A protein has these predicted regions:
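N-terminal Rossmann-like dinucleotide/flavin-binding domain of flavoprotein oxidoreductases
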Residues: 1-40, 144-169
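Rossmann-like dinucleotide/flavin-binding elements
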Residues: 23-35, 46-63, 68-146, 180-189
């Protein structure tokens, strides 16, 4: 999922290989579509989407970034990161941030072959990144739209990374002191 930034390139390449004509930066009027309709069976309107920052009261000096900026590596993250929204993208970005600074497969292989650390230490290095991550979801369930066959493993890995998961919790305000949330237990920062 981390390589989602390459999905667009892959889709474009695959479509072109299949002979799909891709027209960019052109307004498709109803007349254009009707006039050309004899040439194809279907029209796909891929209008795209733009991420938005929810209207949460916040101190403007507190940096807020989009999930896609995190995936693309352009977001500057602090030591403590709160992900607002526990849908599919929110959970995956929380897991991605939680993975930053953990051992890679090659590093683990090397360390196991040469027995550089005890097993317990290797587990710790695999499961604790450099960021403290929390994810806040208003609803009762995290990532409800992820395929059930893979959802459990994504949620399990997110928890394994030590991501604090708050469901049925609302973000009230973002301040310099932290993110103020509210749930049945009351307000907390």
């Amino acid at each position: 999922r981390y390589d989602i930034r390459y999905l667009g390139q892959w889709l474009e390449h695959t479509c072109r290989q299949l002979g799909v004509e891709i027209i960019l930066n052109k307004e498709a009027t109803a007349e254009d579509i009707l006039a050309a309709s004899k040439d194809y069976d279907r029209v796909v309107l891929a209008c795209g989407s733009k991420a938005s920052i929810p209207p949460i009261p916040r101190d403007e000096s507190v940096p807020v970034v989009h999930a896609w900026d995190v995936f693309e590596g352009t977001a500057q993250l602090g030591k403590n990161v709160v992900v607002v929204g526990g849908g599919d993208v929110g959970v995956e970005v929380a897991m991605y941030i939680g993975e930053i600074g953990t051992l890679t497969a090659d590093e683990l292989r090397f360390m196991m072959i040469y027995k550089t650390e005890p097993y317990e230490k290797l587990l710790q290095l695999l499961n604790k990144g450099v960021h403290n991550v929390a994810i806040v979801e208003m609803g009762p369930k995290f990532a409800p739209d992820i395929n059930p066959g893979s959802r459990w493993s994504i949620i399990a890995r997110t928890k394994q990374l030590g991501v604090k998961m708050l469901k049925e919790t609302k973000v009230i305000e973002i301040t310099k002191e932290g993110v103020v949330v509210e749930n049945e237990s009351g307000r907390q920062t």
